[in-house]
Amino acid sequence: MARVAILRNEVPDAAMASRFEREIADALRHAGPSDTPFACAILDEGLHAEIEIELPGWTERLVIPYPAGAGEVRRAVRRLLQDLGLDDEVETFHVVEGRAATDR
């Protein structure tokens, strides 16, 4: 499991701020080698939040529009990890209401 440090969280709504942190940690759980250290900052930019994810050698930024629904932060971070080749979790499929869905 990767190590995650939330260095700053500026989201003004306490419940949403806590959910953002949980979803980021959950998404990064399967990223890279088990000792990979990720540092994150969640910045409030008024109409959206910006999530900075830092790893030695690079920094990526995600924009999450407010209000962010449950799971939106997790999906955005997972998509970023997939794009960077850092997502080690195998995607599984299941049927939900007659259509294929993923665990993501």
What are these regions (language model features)?
Residues 7, 43, 54, 65-67, ...:
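A structural detector for beta-sheet-dominated domains
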Residues 59-80:
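Short secondary-structure boundary motifs at beta->alpha junctions and helix caps
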